[in-house]
């Protein structure tokens, strides 16, 4: 998101490998950055991105972009034309105002209305090119971008589409029930690009959805043997593995430890862009981070996000990335023991930011009416302050977790939330999670499943 409140996210679907053009200039990251700089609306961003690949060539593999402004949300899907062939084939569909959509490393646009110019855009050769390459030979009305350029395989359904299903299932159980057979491989009817949720979603709803591990569904990974005695919803890479000659797999949930950063973008047409555009941003895994507000008018970033003192091989106590990873790596192996301690701090911070939002924006609006520059400075300072305060709280959380759970035993807590210390000054008797009386391995069912045979 930049200062005009246009937001672009992306997910790589790869698609047909023979369509990658290594001579192209514009990769998907460059398309995003340039479009954000040049666009005032989502539709303008689509025009900028497609014009750029037409003129300079497209370097990346298949991409799905979510492009939004305060009034519209679009999904744009794009793939190249092969080595040395400039340009790309693409289609973009507008998401209706009363609907939600999701994408997760698999192309999601199937049939589209070629006559609805207000809600559907596409390259002139999106179908003819597929015919030329032998990917499609039916009627135009039956053409599916996804089927032609990113045919589904087992991984596409179970590792990618399943995450979309879980998102839909959270907000419309009827849709979830309808498409569970598709996710489990018992139906070939694909999910729609978008659905109507059973209620209006809030920012907090979307933040919670980003933390999902299929909890409470048939794909729940907290109850199989891989979850261990502390029901961790995390599995080490790779997703599939072999035992003897048999191949198995673990589920791939929305929230995963391989995440570098996550965000929920909020755009509102009833406010000036400087105030209405908020990027709720966190580093590392969505489940283990704090979504702190960064207003789109900010002219500097918090020091903890800057990377001045850290990189991927250099730890720093001033780096948000490393502090969130430090705490998360403590929690994952002892998840059920420690997650509530983390969640209490996380909820307190995010509730504080959410409850303060109306007041902060009211103050910013008063400033904006008199001096927009001062309003932007005010929101920049607030954005930096919230990010840094979250890191300070997370450092204290990490210190607390080390003490409370040191050496595999759990110290008892006083009613005020501090670690219980008897009058003698020594530690109170410990709770030992390894004792069968307090912890049992629950392996009632397994989602570490056999891969289907290739036959």
Give the positions of each predicted feature.
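Short, solvent-exposed loop/turn segments at secondary-structure junctions
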Residues: 14, 270, 446
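C-terminus-biased signal that marks the final domain/tail of proteins
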Residues: 46, 70-73, 88, 97-440
């Amino acid at each position: 998101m930049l200062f005009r409140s246009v937001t672009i996210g992306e997910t790589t679907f790869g698609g047909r490998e023979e369509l990658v053009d290594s001579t192209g200039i514009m990769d998907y990251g460059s398309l995003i950055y340039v479009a954000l700089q040049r666009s005032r609306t989502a539709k303008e961003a689509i025009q900028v991105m497609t014009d750029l690949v037409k003129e300079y060539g497209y370097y990346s593999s298949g991409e799905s972009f979510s492009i939004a402004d305060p009034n519209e949300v679009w999904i744009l899907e794009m793939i190249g034309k092969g080595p040395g062939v400039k340009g790309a084939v693409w289609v973009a569909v507008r998401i209706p105002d009363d609907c939600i959509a999701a994408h997760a490393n698999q192309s999601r646009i199937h049939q589209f209305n070629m006559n609805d110019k207000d809600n559907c855009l596409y390259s002139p050769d999106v179908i003819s090119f597929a015919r030329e390459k032998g990917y499609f030979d039916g009627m135009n009305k039956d053409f599916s971008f996804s089927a032609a350029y990113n045919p589904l395989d087992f991984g596409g359904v179970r590792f990618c589409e399943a995450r979309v299903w879980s998102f839909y299932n959270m907000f419309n159980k009827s849709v979830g029930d309808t498409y569970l057979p598709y996710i489990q491989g018992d139906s070939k009817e694909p999910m729609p690009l978008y659905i109507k949720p059973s209620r209006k979603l809030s920012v907090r709803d979307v933040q919670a959805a980003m933390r999902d591990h299929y909890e409470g569904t048939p794909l729940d990974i907290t109850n199989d043997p891989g979850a261990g005695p502390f029901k961790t919803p995390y599995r080490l890479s790779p997703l599939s593995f072999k035992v003897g000659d048999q191949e198995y797999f673990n589920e791939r949930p929305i929230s995963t430890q391989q995440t570098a950063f996550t965000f929920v973008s909020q755009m509102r047409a009833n406010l000036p862009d400087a105030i209405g555009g908020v990027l709720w941003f966190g580093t590392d895994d969505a489940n283990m981070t704090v979504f702190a507000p960064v207003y789109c008018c900010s002219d500097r970033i918090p020091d903890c996000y800057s990377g001045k003192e850290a990189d991927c091989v250099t730890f720093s106590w001033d780096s948000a990335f490393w502090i969130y990873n430090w705490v998360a790596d403590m929690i994952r192996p002892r998840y059920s023991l420690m997650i509530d301690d983390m969640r209490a701090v996380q909820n307190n911070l995010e509730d504080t930011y959410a409850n303060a939002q109306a007041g902060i924006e009211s103050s910013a609006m008063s400033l904006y009416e008199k001096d927009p520059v001062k309003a932007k400075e005010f929101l920049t300072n607030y954005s930096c302050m919230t990010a840094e305060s979250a890191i300070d709280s997370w450092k204290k959380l990490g210190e607390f977790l080390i003490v409370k759970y040191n050496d595999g035993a759990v110290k008892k807590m006083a009613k005020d939330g501090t670690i219980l210390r008897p009058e003698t000054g020594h530690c109170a008797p410990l709770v030992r999670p390894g004792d069968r009386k307090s912890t049992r391995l629950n392996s009632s069912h397994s989602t570490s499943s056999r891969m289907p045979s290739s036959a």
